[in-house]
Each structure stands twice: as structure tokens, then as C-alpha cells.
Regions:
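N-terminal beta1-alpha1-beta2 module of alpha/beta enzyme domains
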Residues: 1-57, 63, 158
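Residue-level signal for the nucleotide or nucleotide-sugar donor/cofactor binding architecture
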Residues: 10, 64-68, 72, 107
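Intrinsically disordered, low-complexity acidic/polar segments
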Residues: 14, 66, 169-171
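Conserved N-terminal glycine/acidic-rich loop preference
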Residues: 19, 33, 63-69, 83, ...
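Glycine-rich loops and low-complexity Gly/Arg-rich segments
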Residues: 28-33, 55-58, 80-83, 111-115
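Short acidic-hydrophobic sequence patches enriched in Asp/Glu that either
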Residues: 38, 69, 111
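A general structural signal for well-ordered alpha-helical segments in protein cores
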Residues: 40-43, 70, 116
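Internal, glycine-rich beta/alpha segment that forms the wall or movable "lid"
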Residues: 72-75, 79-176
Length: 176
């Protein structure tokens, strides 16, 4: 059995001590979540101070970002974490998406499914598996020039997990 936990960080600088402590007491994974601080930044520090702990977001708000932004973040984090990164995405709730992030809210399960599909298409392009040609109902990613293509990740693309409530989002998570 593997044991993972989230690390509540009042100050993102605390990642340099909290995550090594989790590793030293036997946890297999340590995750951040989107609350007072961006969930990705503390993981950079955690990666510098750990060697085996799986690191990831549980969760980053997907609807506050676009698939290309998320793919670039995940690719960079996978490199910095030495192949230990997990991209965990969640939708948040409608009032926060619309009023806090000023982003559209529509068909959350379909949107989450398409975000994950688009991220995977972007990863495939970077891994040399063909041109970028993702054409969904909500997102389109159809151009990737060498200046923006990080190329194959030396650790492979990170896993993408989703979280959510209700049967539709559970179905998305099952197929993510």
C-alpha cells in the first residue's frame, strides 16, 4: 500500500522542510492544493529537497487555466521532479470559476474531459507522436513550432488525475 497526503502550506517556503519530513517518515507522496498559493510553486522547492517522494497537485484548478498552460507546467514539473510529478486537476465550483477566476463555466464534465484529452494530445506532439491537431468543442490546439516545443520529456509525460463530485465527474476521473 502506498500512502500519500496533502501538505497544507500557509507559506510556500515551508515546502523545503515539510516535504522532506514527509519523505523521512515514510510517506510515498506529498501533494499541494490550490488555496492561498499557486499549487505548483511549492513543488519546485519540494523537488529540490526530496529524492523519492511522489509530488503533485491535488488539485490545481483546471478551469482557471488552458490545456497548453497546464501541459507546459506539467512538463516542466516532471523534469524538475525527476519523473515523480503527478498533475492532479479539479474543476472548482461555478461561483469561483466565474467570479474569482473570471473564466467561463459550462458543461464541467465535458470541459474537464476535453482538457485532459488536449493535454494528452500536446504531450503526444512533444513526444514526437505526430503533429499537434487537437480540435475539440471547447479547445483547439493546432500549432506547435520548434520554439515552443520542449521535445520529449526525459522522464515521459506525467500522469494526469482528475478529481470531482458526482457521477459525470467520476466518469471523467475513471477515464483520465
Amino acid at each position: 500500500m502506498k500512502i500519500h497526503t496533502t501538505a497544507p502550506l500557509e507559506d510556500p517556503r515551508d515546502a523545503r522542510t515539510i516535504f522532506p519530513r514527509l519523505e523521512s517518515i515514510g510517506y510515498d507522496g506529498g501533494f499541494t492544493f490550490e488555496a492561498k498559493h499557486d499549487p505548483f510553486l511549492p513543488l519546485v522547492r519540494a523537488a529540490e529537497h526530496t529524492t523519492r517522494l511522489r509530488l503533485g497537485t491535488a488539485v490545481a484548478i483546471a478551469f482557471a487555466r488552458n490545456p497548453m498552460n497546464l501541459a507546459h507546467l506539467a512538463c516542466g514539473m516532471q523534469i524538475l521532479c525527476g519523473g515523480r510529478f503527478v498533475l492532479g486537476l479539479g474543476s472548482q465550483v461555478r461561483p469561483h470559476v466565474e467570479k474569482r477566476f473570471s473564466m467561463p463555466w459550462s458543461r464541467p464534465a465535458a470541459r474537464m474531459r476535453e482538457i485532459v484529452q488536449a493535454i494528452r494530445a500536446i504531450f503526444d506532439c512533444w513526444e514526437g507522436k505526430g503533429e499537434l491537431d487537437f480540435r475539440g468543442e471547447l479547445y483547439r490546439h493546432t500549432i506547435m513550432i520548434p520554439a515552443f516545443d520542449p521535445g520529449p520529456n526525459p522522464f515521459g509525460p506525467p500522469p494526469v488525475f482528475t478529481g470531482g463530485f458526482g457521477p459525470r465527474m467520476t466518469d471523467v476521473a475513471r477515464h483520465a
